[in-house]
Amino acid sequence: MYEWKLNEIVDSGVCARCGTCTIVCPNGILTFDERPKLIDECLRKGHGMCFEVCPRVSSAKYQIKIREKFYEKYYYAKSDIEGQDGGVVTAFLKYLLENGKIDGAIVVGDECWKPVSLVVQNAEDLLKTAKSKYAISTLDALRKAGEMGLEKVAVVGLPCQINGLRKLQYFPYHAKHDLELGRNGKPVKLPKIEYLIGLFCTEKFRYDNMKEVLSKHGIDIEKVEKFDIKKGKLLVYVNGEKKEFDLKEFEICSGCKMCRDFDAEMADVSVGCVGSPDGYSTIIIRTEKGEEIKNAVELKEGVNLEEIEKLRQLKLKRFKKEVERRRENNEYVSFYWTADYGGIGKRADGTYFIRVRAKPGGWYKPEEIKEILDIAEEYNAKIKVTDRAGYELHGISGFDVEDIVLRLREKGLLTGSEGPLVRATLACPGGGNCSSGLVDTTELARIIEDNFKERPAPYKFKIAISGCPNGCVRPQVHDIGIAGVKYPKVNEEKCNGCGRCAEVCKVEAIDIRGETSYTNYNVCVGCGKCIKNCPNEAREVKEEGYLVYVGGKTGREVVEGVKMKLMSVDEIINFIDKVLVVYGKYAEKPQRERLAAVMKRVGYGKFLEEVKELMKKEIC
């Protein structure tokens, strides 16, 4: 047996048997026969892409969800194509093929009902695969499609397979690097997955076990015409007759007990029979690409949502029961579902931390702090205050992460601000709290949070607001930095040259000549102290507002941001939005290139000019 990092997942029975790991290995040394297996020595011992796409290592759902912006629209339909429960999936794939949306479809065919992964490129071959198989299947055909030179495909898969393929689509965002290179210096060749079509699934069965059980009842699996699952029964159609079997007679894949996804939550469109009339399929549209199914079949409203929710809860109940069983028996659990939520990270000691996204300006209500303290005491956790005024609970068991996250939500405390997204806005106390504050930093932080909270970005994206040019929160070295400023002018009729303004000016930008004070605007930083301290009200406001910096950073390299002109609140929101758009356009290496690096590579002038043009279009 070769050393392989995924052995713990596979051998412990946590493996979903989705087959995603086998298709991404650039060296082709993984095979799949109802479970993945390493057939040759791996130079990195499995510390690579096979591990990083595994949906049982981490779901990566949160990072995927904020990028796909999933929603749910429920319909039911049937087509004029003979297939499982109305042939909806077949009809959709037929539409995509005939309209050039895809070059091929990755579907499951069968050899005597043993699932076989197939590449289908025409409607005629598609019809031959139009019935459900309930045994463990693979995704081998996706790799074959790449070798055939196909560029765009749709994939039909079970919830676990959809999860693995979504992780493949967004690989750099959660793995923090590009695809693994093989011994030939190249990554695996795969087509672009344009559409993910998910199938409802409660469990899947071992093929050999299905064959054996049916044989005991005098049924030759080779003569079965159709399988279906309804109300806890496996329906087997042979010679025009329907026979029912209790699902408990069949051995389900052990990893299915660790699954909590009934309806393929990360698919573009999910399809199944639950919740719709006989002969129809329920359709859940989740993305804009999923909306295209409307061009293939006529959709009807009126899905029985209670039936779907019942199956969701049954699967979740089974999952929780299995997790608890493993906990009691000290068996391996991967805690893959903790990645369903933002702000969760694994510590060096194997426990977890939960980051509470900082409230706007770092201001908390007493009851919010009390809740954090109560949780820390109850779960024996340590508390860390982050440099962005957030709270982290450390030393949390993986078994408790989800319960704590949901409990925090009930108190209005959002977990997040971790990964390639807009982090919590850092702000000093600001005007009304600090004697030097010129602007209300808390209100501006709230507006920014309302517009950009957890917005996805190529890499972490940090914003800081300082109430004055003192810059105690270092706005110059943030992706976006904002500082309140107030520049003075002199009312010569009121000025008597007393010199008080020059005394309070920390940058020595003021000279007194006779009975008048003069400001050197090349030195003045706009702190407004001279205006505030003039006993004769001779210092007035020449210009005030928000000074903005863009493209700063700290870390391995310190970069000071480019200073922009003064902006209003509306202009700041427009500016941040367009900076994120242009950043996303030019970033080539997700999780590797901060905004500063992209601006430098593209050219500061070109980058900012494009931002300005987009801002103008917004205004128009």
From Swiss-Prot:
Describe how the cofactor binds.
Binds 4 [4Fe-4S] cluster.
Record note on pH: Optimum pH is 7.0.
Q: Where on this chain does siroheme bind?
A: 472
Q: For binding [4Fe-4S] cluster 3, which residues are annotated in this chain's numbering?
A: 495, 498, 501, 505
Q: What EC number(s) has UniProt assigned to this enzyme?
A: 1.8.98.3
The coenzyme or cofactor needed here is: [4Fe-4S] cluster; siroheme
Entry keywords, A to Z: 4Fe-4S, Heme, Iron, Iron-sulfur, Metal-binding, Oxidoreductase, Repeat
GO molecular function: any one? metal ion binding
Asked whether the UniProt record includes Repressor among its keywords, one would answer no
List residues binding [4Fe-4S] cluster 2.
428, 434, 468, 472
* Reactions the enzyme catalyzes: 3 oxidized coenzyme F420-(gamma-L-Glu)(n) + hydrogen sulfide + 3 H2O + 2 H(+) = 3 reduced coenzyme F420-(gamma-L-Glu)(n) + sulfite
- Activity's thermal dependence: Optimum temperature is above 95 degrees Celsius.
Inducing factors: Induced by sulfite.
Q: Where is the 4Fe-4S ferredoxin-type domain?
A: 6-35, 486-515, 520-544
**Domain comment (free text):** Contains an N-terminal H(2)F420 dehydrogenase domain and a C-terminal dissimilatory-type siroheme sulfite reductase domain.
Give the family from UniProt: Belongs to the nitrite and sulfite reductase 4Fe-4S domain family.
Task: Relay the record's extra comment.
Answer: Expression in Methanococcus maripaludis, a sulfite-sensitive methanogen, leads to sulfite detoxification and use of sulfite as a sole sulfur source by M.maripaludis.
Identification of the protein by name: Coenzyme F420-dependent sulfite reductase
From the broadest rank down, the organism's phylogenetic lineage runs: Archaea, Methanobacteriati, Methanobacteriota, Methanomada group, Methanococci
Gene from which this protein is expressed: fsr
